Amino acid sequence: LPDWFVFQKLLAASISHSIVESGLDQIGGYVTEASSVVGLRTPADLLAAYGVDSAPEFADVVRFEQPRIATFSKPSNSDRPWRDFPHGFLLGGSLAPVWRMSRTRFSYGAEYWRIRSDGEQKRLSRYEGAARGWVGAKRWRPPSPIVGTLARWQGREYFADVIAENVLLTAIADEGPAGFEGVRPRVWSATVPLSECEVFERVFTAQVDGVPVRILRHAGENAEVLLLSDEPADAERVDAGRVEAGVFEAVVAAGRLADVHGVENQWVPSADK
């Protein structure tokens, strides 16, 4: 993986809908290098590179900077009921490298684009961090504290969006910390130097009926989980739904979570250079 660049992700219709309707702020799964697919100028060309023979009126993509702390792996070479990329490249002549990216929040400045069949491209929205979310989305969903970057600053923890040498901190509280600006009810934001922050993420994993999962959100008696297996039989066992190729999610009773483990991954800025 190169040191730093912009990714592009082809969006399943359900994900496009969730961005617009409910402010979906998480991303993962198959991603490719944006500069390697600039020649795929129509929905048909783009979908063909993913092994889909279709020519819809439009296709939606999101373009975003490499998220901090996200991890990348080669696609599976197992036999699956969907098109995979065992050689690590999209299909056809683009030779665009493709990776599977761990689940994280969108990086600040991510852009949601629509590519039309006549080749026109139009930016529909832009992600402006944990506090503000997607511009023009119908709803804002509070970020999950166990998906995406956090920061410690002056002894407190905040949601964090790293922007060059600064960090956009977000607090969700009845009253904002001193110097923070109110963005929406109970949501506060401030920009501070990166050098004053410790940036990290928390990842919780568990087992549900023997299937490995990552916990995405824990609310009351239920938990939203991402399967860490792309085996269809595992998805069926826990009644998980397929979000996109190779990605399964489920809402389960918290009591079904076994062998829960948490890890804190620190971001070292020099590691990205």
Language-model-derived ranges and their functions:
Residues 1-273:
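Short, surface-exposed polybasic-aromatic patches that bind anionic ligands, especially phosphate groups
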